[in-house]
From Swiss-Prot:
It comes from Methylobacterium nodulans (strain LMG 21967 / CNCM I-2342 / ORS 2060). The system is composed of three essential subunits: KdpA, KdpB and KdpC. It is a multi-pass membrane protein. Belongs to the KdpA family. GO terms for molecular function: P-type potassium transmembrane transporter activity; potassium ion binding. This is Potassium-transporting ATPase potassium-binding subunit. It holds the Pfam family KdpA. Keywords: Cell inner membrane, Cell membrane, Ion transport, Membrane, Potassium, Potassium transport, Transmembrane, Transmembrane helix, Transport. It is found in: Cell inner membrane. InterPro entries: KdpA (IPR004623). Its main location: membrane. The chain crosses the membrane at residues 5-25, 64-84, 136-156, 178-198, 254-274, 285-305, 330-350, 357-379, 421-441, 488-508, 527-547. Part of the high-affinity ATP-driven potassium transport (or Kdp) system, which catalyzes the hydrolysis of ATP coupled with the electrogenic transport of potassium into the cytoplasm. This subunit binds the periplasmic potassium ions and delivers the ions to the membrane domain of KdpB through an intramembrane tunnel.
Amino acid sequence: MTLNGWTQITLYGAVVLALVKPLGWYMTRVFTGERTLLSPVLAPIERGLYRAAGIDARQEQTWLGYAGALLLFHVFGFLVLYAILRLQAALPLNPADQAAVAPDLAFNTSASFITNTNWQNYGGESTLSYLSQMLGLTHQNFLSAATGIAVAVALIRGFARASTRTLGSFWVDLTRAILYVLLPICILYTLFLVWQGIPQTLGAYIDATTLEGGKQTIALGPVASQVAIKMLGTNGGGFFNANAAHPFENPTALSNFVQMVSIFAIGAALTNVFGRMVGDERQGWAILAAMGALFLAGVAVAYWAEANGSPVLASFGLSGGNLEGKEVRFDIAASALFAVVTTAASCGAVNAMHDSFTALGGMIPLVNMQLGEVIIGGVGAGLYGMLIFVVVAIFVAGLMVGRTPEYLGKKIETKEVKMAMLGILCLPLMMLGFTALATVLPTGLAGPANAGPHGFSEILYAYTSAAANNGSAFAGLSGNTPFYNATLAVGMLVGRFFVIIPALAIAGALAAKKTVPASAGTFPTDGALFVGLLVGVILIIGGLTFFPALALGPVVEHLAGAAGQTFAMGD
């Protein structure tokens, strides 16, 4: 570990914190319907879109109506994306003559991109046409990110409103998230990325002759526009197979830093939106503090583990940190920080190969996802996931003091707790259930490239990433098989919608309740005690649930490495 590394981490945290209030203020105005700087230009476009779609922007929906509209929208989006991928060979903007995507891979990819996961069992430059990348994937990157923001805003309204059955309009929230938040930032962001050296072209791939006389095909495409939304929207799917490790996706240290900031920007700012909309900004800062505590702990462990390197190599007197799988233009600190950021925020983009991290260094991204992607989390998804944990934490606090649990003047009762636990428990069910299945079936065991505990970790990481809607991978797993394409897709769909629906049900139940005035016995939820309780609940539920699986994978791998033991295929 170096002073330069810690300086990078400190600067990163400072920049993200500096964006929380201004971006939170702006998004609050957007979703409360107030005038913004962009309203003179965008408001007429917004009204025109509503007229064209036959939507009454003033008509709000109950939680069931909101959820129904959301699900219908995603079914349609899934079918359209699946059709684009299957018909790719017959569609235009295909200069490399890419063939149609296989049915099982198209199913997996469609599920992946509508759920904001962006798990990729293919190499983008060798599988997809420009049309599929733009109209199919980039389009869904905007829609899935906007959906997460919309659900978070609906849940905030559930806490903020009283004695009402409505949560707003899904169509309005979706439109405003794209039109006022995602698109304006992405336009400027794309220009910055082009300036940094990322291609943005519809020209064909280039056939080049190397200095040694060999032939090489240089893949190009509309890369910058996809990178902008994949980072800002915490989607994570790469235009190229190497993702953000590819110099055409992430060419410089500056582009790397800005991409990391953009991953956290909206998710962190939504905590401020929460505080503003419920009338007490301290509530938002308390939630952000809990997120920050978990994030800093993860960064410290991951950086320490990668800086110290493999214990097996250290036993031979080799030091200098673990540089395997890392780009030389990014040092160990930037690679470890990116890994923690991308898995804390359910982004899944990578600038280094997580499969090449040390056992403990690779365990941190795994744990980040297993905690429910609530450490900032995906845009919107992180906040509504954290608020689900808040409901459980408040319920636990009420049990400890023998009082009816209350949060922001709303009583937390049986329905809210049941829905919260449904949203929490569906993730380990997918992560651990499918991992167990893959480890006992020959088709599952054929996937990992490594034996022993690391091979188990590759399987566990895949299903954890899918259910947590992250999309990153221990890439030693060969996942492009019917078994993995199908099971990973199911994990992604359940991990997305079986959290969204309980979150909306909680919002509907809370919005219908009257606000109870605070009393002397009300548990304060804006201080260090609440932050500690919330972090404790997250660690207990997440940590204890997954500890046996972690013990079989990265923990055993680390202990075996410290004892000088390695595993070959077949061991």
